[in-house]
């Protein structure tokens, strides 16, 4: 409720031209002031970096590519099974690439 109220007040007091704003805010509490900030568009003529693993026109992987991103993807190929992609936390063991996906596994499954 407080977050919605602060955002509403903030937008009313600090209106900006344009359709998109980002609110700079962490944990909103009674004493925090939330300030809006404009989204900075790319300069005219600039293009976002091209991903060599992905064909932007078709939204598909390029020929020979196995993956386009992820902690277990390197140069469009799956990283070998067993490579640590995320270190252990608490009682969980290290997370390791499977060799079958560009993504690092989310959970461990025990038999």
Swiss-Prot record:
Designated name of the protein: Disintegrin subunit alpha
Annotated motif Cell attachment site, positions: 89-91
Carries keyword Disulfide bond?
yes
Pinpoint the Disintegrin domain residues: 45-111
Signal peptide location: 1-20
Keywords for the protein's UniProt record, in alphabetical order: Cell adhesion impairing toxin, Disulfide bond, Secreted, Signal, Toxin
- Cross-referenced SMART domains: DISIN (SM00050)
